[in-house]
Amino acid sequence: MKRSKTLTLVEGAVMVALATVLSFIRIYKLPWGGSITLLSMLPIAVFSIKHGVAKGLGVAFVFSLVQFIQGITDGLFGWGLSPVMLVACIFIDYLAAYTVLGVAGMFRKKGAVGWIAGTMIAVFLRFVCHFLSGVVIWKSFGALSVSYTHLRAHETLANLV
């Protein structure tokens, strides 16, 4: 049976909704922003594995917009960032970091090993985005005395689940 575009669109919307609900289940809220959530990246990765990278990136981008809106309600604008740093934070910490989850399907035709490898690459790319954002933000505050090791530890915790 040939899959319709409408069915794929609805499935993507359901996965974004499920990922959003899971992102509200916070196991631990980190002191400098971010949190450990209950498998909130999994629905986006599953969609990307099932439908491919192109559609996965599209759904992941929609999820990034939802996460940005959630970040606004969590107090993103209360951080006291300069306008340039705020724009950098929005693009790196939200749009790029969540959109890269769509690459989880890059090895989808390789079976379970490919699914795991693609998901691990997606999570690593998300970590890189958050790490770069942390460097940019803390450098703008003049607080780069915070070591890169400490920053890596913070971002690693934020990307665990």
Where are these regions (language model features)?
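Mid-bilayer segments of alpha-helical transmembrane spans in multi-pass integral membrane proteins
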Residues: Y98, G102, V123, F127-V135
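Internal alpha-helical transmembrane segments of multi-pass membrane proteins
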Residues: K110-R126
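Conserved small/polar residues in nucleotide/adenosyl-binding loops
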Residues: T149-T156
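Hydrophobic alpha-helical transmembrane segments
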Residues: L9-A13, L57-F61, V87-F91, I116-M120
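Interfacial aromatic-anchored transmembrane helix boundaries in multi-pass membrane proteins
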Residues: L22-I36, V62-F107, W138
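Hydrophobic transmembrane alpha-helices
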Residues: M1-V59
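Membrane-helix interface motif
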Residues: V135-G142
